[in-house]
């Protein structure tokens, strides 16, 4: 039976999640989990599922807030939001960067086609109030300065942040990347606008229903829509319903990927979907060690069942994770399955 070098893995995990070697974090880990102190596989699983300490996470948020304060000096008619794994507490690095969205409030993209389709397909199920809301949106005036507004927000942000931060990389098409050296944190600043479809309009533009579109500096275009706030809301809600178990599984797979000798080409977006897709009743009453065979079963089913893998959707439900032609990503899934399989085999005598 293949066995992992758990001493090395545990050291990797500690360096990643507690890079400053804060003793109180290590002490708390062993006091909270006395059963794992002398057992390598249990110790690794426990730490791999644990969240990053708030001491680190709070610094990432604070670095984002400092950037926001600088931008508020020069930008008008924008709204600031955060996206990414820090917002769901599924990040695995103590020194995690954070994504600050700078969203224009001057305009929004209206998905007219989606609204027209909803009016036609759901005309007998929608209330009169909702029908009127959708119809009213279609009467709105078009806005013709969208790209220029976003370009201007990007240029002003570059100028301001370059004057404030010694490390400020403005070469990336979709983000400005700064490093706050005193805090040891990176922040990605992303220029965007709101995107509204029928669901957003019907739900009074509550943030979880609104999409965003990111500005691409290189092509001077607006990218396709994303729904980061719906994903954040769904992961947080499902994990709350399962007393943190969903987030434990997400962190576990992300740590396995990070510790693997193989190059596993699966993003956090992909791993979120893999875990979110598991029926919550399967793990609602499982302890942390019992989550490992549940993950093994999920990955094994995806690898062996073409219908299941081809139908797996993102957490927000708007896109498929594994396209039929993406062989590399499916191979990466097999690699991740193998990593889980080894841990599972080492764990079985303790279940």
Curated annotation (Swiss-Prot):
GO terms under biological process: defense response to virus
Any one GO molecular-function label of the UniProt entry: GTP binding
Top EC class of this enzyme: transferase
InterPro entries linked: NT_sf (IPR043519), Polymerase_NTP_transf_dom (IPR002934)
Endpoints of the signal sequence: none
EC number: 2.7.7.65
Sorted UniProt keywords: Antiviral defense, GTP-binding, Nucleotide-binding, Nucleotidyltransferase, Transferase
Reactions accelerated catalytically: 2 GTP = 3',3'-c-di-GMP + 2 diphosphate
Further remark: Bacteria with this enzyme do not have other c-di-GMP synthase enzymes (no GGDEF or EAL-domain containing proteins), suggesting this second messenger has been co-opted for CBASS signaling via STING activation.
Sequence similarity: Belongs to the CD-NTase family. E05 subfamily.
Reported function: Cyclic nucleotide synthase (second messenger synthase) of a CBASS antivirus system. CBASS (cyclic oligonucleotide-based antiphage signaling system) provides immunity against bacteriophage. The CD-NTase protein synthesizes cyclic nucleotides in response to infection; these serve as specific second messenger signals. The signals activate a diverse range of effectors, leading to bacterial cell death and thus abortive phage infection. A type I-D(GG) CBASS system.
Protein name: c-di-GMP synthase
């Amino acid at each position: 039976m293949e066995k992992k070098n758990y001493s090395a893995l545990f050291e990797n995990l500690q360096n990643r999640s507690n890079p400053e070697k804060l003793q109180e974090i290590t002490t708390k880990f062993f006091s909270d989990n006395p059963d794992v102190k002398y057992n390598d596989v249990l110790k690794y699983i426990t730490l791999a599922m644990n969240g990053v300490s708030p001491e680190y996470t709070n610094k990432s948020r604070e670095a984002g807030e400092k950037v926001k304060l600088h931008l508020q000096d020069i930008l008008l008619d924008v709204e600031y939001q955060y996206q990414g794994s820090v917002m769901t507490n599924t990040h695995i690095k103590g020194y995690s960067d954070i994504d600050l969205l700078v969203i224009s409030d001057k305009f929004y993209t209206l998905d007219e086609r989606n609204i027209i389709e909803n009016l036609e397909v759901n005309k007998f199920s929608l209330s009169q109030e909702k029908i009127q809301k959708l119809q009213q949106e279609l009467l709105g005036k078009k806005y013709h300065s969208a790209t220029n507004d976003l370009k201007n927000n990007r240029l002003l942000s570059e100028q301001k942040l370059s004057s404030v931060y010694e490390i400020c990389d403005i070469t990336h098409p979709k983000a400005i990347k700064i490093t706050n050296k005193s805090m040891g944190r990176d922040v990605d600043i992303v220029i965007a606008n709101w995107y509204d479809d029928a669901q957003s309009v019907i739900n009074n533009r509550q943030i979880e229903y609104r999409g965003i579109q990111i500005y691409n500096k290189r092509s001077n275009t607006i990218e396709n829509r994303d729904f980061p706030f719906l994903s954040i809301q769904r992961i947080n809600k499902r994990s709350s319903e399962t007393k943190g178990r969903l987030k434990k599984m997400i962190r576990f797979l992300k740590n396995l990927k990070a510790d693997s000798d193989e190059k596993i080409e699966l993003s956090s977006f992909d791993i979120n979907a893999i875990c979110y897709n598991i029926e919550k009743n399967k793990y609602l009453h499982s302890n942390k060690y019992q989550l490992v065979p549940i993950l093994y079963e999920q990955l094994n089913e995806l690898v062996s069942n073409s219908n299941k893998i081809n139908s797996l959707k993102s957490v927000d439900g708007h896109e498929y994770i594994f396209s039929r032609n993406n062989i590399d990503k499916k191979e990466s899934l097999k690699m991740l399955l193998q990593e889980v399989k080894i841990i599972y085999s080492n764990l079985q005598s303790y279940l």
